[in-house]
Amino acid sequence: MLPRYDLPNAAPPPLREVQLLLNSEDLENEIDWLPDWLAERGLARAERRARALRAALRALVRANNGTPLDDEAVATVNAAARRVSIQVDASGAVRVATDGDALDQVVAIALGAMLDGSWGRLKACRHCRWTFYDRSPNRSGTWCSMQLCGNRKKTRAYRKRRSAAR
């Protein structure tokens, strides 16, 4: 069963669909929901492609935290982007579109977010590596959730200070 997003770190639609793919694996607890994600979208046979795309998009998200981009991730996303088109709608707005499957839709959403600037708000938690949407005004968020990883970090710091004072 896929994790759901009712937490404050959930990206707004449609970027939430990208976040769902990226978080289809819990790296900290070694749980992989990718087969469920694919089955829900009728793509059970696209697992290899999905794993490559998920890894590449994660690398792009880590770049939002300051990690250098790797060439393989860029090449994977660029290859997937060939199934996506840039269009101008009747109002003159530019949008990214595809008639492809759910993975192509994820690529279109990600590229659209890069164009509109919202991509920079998707980040990887420095503790658990979960992808979260940074809602802080200055885009300085570092944890997936203050209740989870933020609390863990602060508790460790408190214990360290306390043991040093003894």
Where in this protein do the model-derived segments appear?
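BZIP DNA-binding basic region
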Residues: 105-106, 112-159, 163-166
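Short helix-coil boundary/hinge micro-motifs
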Residues: 1-133
